[in-house]
């Protein structure tokens, strides 16, 4: 039994869910998202509730049941509220700047690292040590935030690098002298 797959999704005001074949489309105040779902999973919309059922009880279908429900729930949340990931730059001389459609990171390399804006995401730099990535697709927001973090991920000795807000970096002790 998939406990997550059996939960119904309650639609907020202004959000519509429709299905054509295996493609689910979610429309809301912030935009529209579409995703293909597995053919073994069927979706039913009744009023403001969306429910998912599976055609068999084999392990792969059970896994797809919960995953499909979670993906559609994230789409509903994205088109109604949106998603935001905040990154913090920790280190002497580390800074971020936004000029036009380009994010520039100075994080200790001999050259600045540039990121072009993605069409469906917004990147803000409220101050030189903070970068906010926001959009309607949880996956796309997380992917871009992970790409930015991978430029200089936090190191365990001094904790310098780019980290998610609230991320705890496990620190190590340095070598002890003779």
Curated annotation (Swiss-Prot):
SUPFAM superfamilies in the cross-refs: Ribosomal protein L6
Key words, A-Z: Ribonucleoprotein, Ribosomal protein, RNA-binding, rRNA-binding
Swiss-Prot/TrEMBL GO biological process terms: cytoplasmic translation
GO cellular component, as recorded: cytosolic large ribosomal subunit
Pfam families: Ribosomal_L6
Molecular-function GO term, any one: rRNA binding
HAMAP family reported in the protein's UniProt record: Ribosomal_uL6_B (MF_01365_B)
PANTHER family linked to this entry: 60S/50S RIBOSOMAL PROTEIN L6/L9, LARGE RIBOSOMAL SUBUNIT PROTEIN UL6M
Function in brief: This protein binds to the 23S rRNA, and is important in its secondary structure. It is located near the subunit interface in the base of the L7/L12 stalk, and near the tRNA binding site of the peptidyltransferase center.
Subunit structure: Part of the 50S ribosomal subunit.
Protein family according to the UniProt entry: Belongs to the universal ribosomal protein uL6 family.
Protein name: Large ribosomal subunit protein uL6
């Amino acid at each position: 039994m998939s406990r997550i797959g059996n939960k119904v999704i309650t639609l907020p005001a202004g959000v519509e869910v429709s299905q054509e074949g295996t493609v689910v489309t979610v429309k809301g105040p912030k935009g529209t998202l579409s995703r293909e779902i597995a053919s073994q999973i069927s979706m039913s919309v009744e009023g403001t509730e969306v429910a998912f059922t599976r055609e068999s009880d084999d392990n792969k279908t059970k896994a797809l049941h919960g995953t499909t429900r979670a993906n559609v729930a994230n789409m509903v949340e994205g088109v109604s509220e949106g998603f935001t990931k905040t990154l913090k730059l920790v280190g002497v001389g580390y800074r971020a700047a936004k000029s036009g459609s380009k994010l520039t990171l100075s994080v200790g390399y001999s050259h600045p690292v540039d990121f072009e804006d993605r069409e469906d995401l917004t990147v803000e730099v409220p101050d030189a040590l903070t970068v906010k990535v926001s959009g309607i697709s949880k996956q796309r927001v997380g992917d871009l935030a992970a790409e930015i973090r991978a430029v200089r991920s936090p190191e365990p000795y001094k904790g310098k690098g780019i980290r998610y807000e609230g991320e705890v970096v496990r620190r190590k002790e340095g070598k002890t002298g003779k």
